[in-house]
């Protein structure tokens, strides 16, 4: 284990002792708010400190087993026993080190949240809209694999069965943490269904993944800053699908951010969903501005998540998916399009963790 990690972990042991002393004080016990705050920290710090103590004990066990091995060259049974202890301790040490590294990394408070995923057709006309539908299918299939719930919040269908734009809400465990790296430009290379000469075309869609904010964040929006318009919901080609003004469009006047919803059964439900999407977009705007500032200071991690960033290419003739941010290439495009995204998601998460660990080491040496 690297020295800087040992230094960080030693601080957890020290802090645990401080917290145990504070929680034993009568004045703290009488202040319920402070007591709960310190108790929560005690639980988090204790989880790290206990693993660090176990790691140190294993190091001592490993050292003892290695000493035993050196002194038992003439005893095959003792040699075998010592080697088994060495193998077991080494394996558990590596597992614990990986756990401790993950626990030391800075946590994104939004990772555990639900998310909105917006998919917009870009360059490529009808083919781009069809690819937007393929991306929607890919994400919904991935949700099924993860046991998440996905529902369409807003959609603008195209003439050929694709989408000019579609927004889905995904509910489940750590949705945003898994999907946040999907934000950006997705390029597809294939022969479109509308192509009669068999030529490969290139088109693109943009994806934005927004964490669903707390209700408290939504409450902070001043109603006076909102303009709410109602209109008739329509299907593909503008065909009206009902005769009441049930669709809702909400504009946040200070930022110009707009959200609309027409898929609910009533104006009330559409307004509620549109407000949630609007809040998520405002939250994401603030977040992306902070991320851009942080990236300028530390050269960025995986990328800004800006729609203009081309993050990935889907090459159907070669069966290839390439994520340009981490130089990941997989030749299993068809299974990925059926929702088998785990290899991609895990590679991006591992890359972020490695970058964060490097930043942590750099900060420790500063």
From Swiss-Prot:
Modified residues (N5-methylglutamine): 239
InterPro entries, A to Z: PCRF, Pep_chain_release_fac_I, Pep_chain_release_fac_I_sf, Prokaryotic/Mito_RF, RF-1
One Pfam family recorded for the sequence: RF-1
Keyword hit for Protein biosynthesis: yes
Localization in the cell: Cytoplasm
Major site of localization recorded for this protein: cytoplasm
SUPFAM superfamilies, A to Z: Release factor (SSF75620)
Swiss-Prot/TrEMBL keywords: Cytoplasm, Methylation, Protein biosynthesis
Post-translational modification: Methylated by PrmC. Methylation increases the termination efficiency of RF1.
GO cellular component, as recorded: cytoplasm
Molecular function via GO: translation release factor activity, codon specific
Function: Peptide chain release factor 1 directs the termination of translation in response to the peptide chain termination codons UAG and UAA.
Family: Belongs to the prokaryotic/mitochondrial release factor family.
UniProt-recorded name of the protein: Peptide chain release factor 1
Organism for this UniProt entry: Albidiferax ferrireducens (strain ATCC BAA-621 / DSM 15236 / T118)
């Amino acid at each position: 284990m690297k020295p800087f990690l040992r230094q960080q972990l030693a601080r957890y042991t020290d802090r645990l002792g401080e917290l145990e002393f504070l929680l034993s004080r009568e004045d703290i016990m009488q202040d319920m708010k402070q007591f709960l705050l310190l108790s929560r920290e005690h639980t988090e710090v204790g989880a790290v400190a206990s693993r660090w103590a176990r790691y140190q004990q294993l190091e001592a066990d490993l050292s003892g087993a290695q000493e035993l091995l050196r002194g038992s060259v003439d005893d095959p049974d003792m040699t075998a026993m010592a080697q088994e202890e060495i193998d077991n301790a080494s394996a558990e040490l590596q597992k614990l080190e990986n756990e401790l590294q993950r626990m030391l990394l800075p946590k994104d408070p939004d990772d555990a949240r639900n998310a909105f995923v917006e998919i917009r057709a870009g360059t490529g006309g009808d083919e781009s809209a069809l690819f937007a539908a393929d991306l929607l299918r890919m994400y919904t299939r991935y949700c099924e694999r993860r046991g998440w719930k996905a529902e369409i919040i807003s959609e603008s269908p195209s003439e050929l069965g694709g989408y000019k734009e579609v927004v889905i809400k995904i509910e489940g465990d750590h949705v945003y943490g898994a999907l946040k790296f999907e934000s950006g430009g997705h390029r597809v290379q294939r022969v479109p269904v509308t192509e009669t000469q068999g030529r490969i075309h290139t088109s693109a869609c943009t994806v934005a993944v927004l964490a669903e904010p707390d209700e408290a964040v939504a409450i902070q929006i001043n109603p006076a800053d909102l303009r709410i318009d109602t209109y008739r919901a329509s299907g593909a080609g503008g065909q009206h699908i009902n005769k009441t003004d049930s669709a809702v469009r909400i504009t946040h006047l200070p930022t110009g951010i707009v959200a609309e919803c027409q898929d609910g059964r009533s104006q009330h439900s559409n307004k509620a969903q549109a407000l949630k999407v609007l809040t998520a977009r405002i939250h994401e705007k603030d977040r992306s501005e902070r991320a851009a500032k942080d990236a300028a200071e530390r050269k960025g991690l995986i990328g800004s998540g800006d729609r203009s960033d081309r993050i990935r290419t889907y090459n159907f003739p070669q069966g290839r998916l390439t994520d340009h941010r981490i130089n990941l290439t997989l030749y299993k495009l068809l299974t990925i399009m059926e929702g088998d995204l785990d290899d991609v998601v895990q590679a991006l998460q591992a890359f972020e963790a490695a970058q964060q660990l490097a930043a942590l080491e750099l900060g420790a040496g500063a």
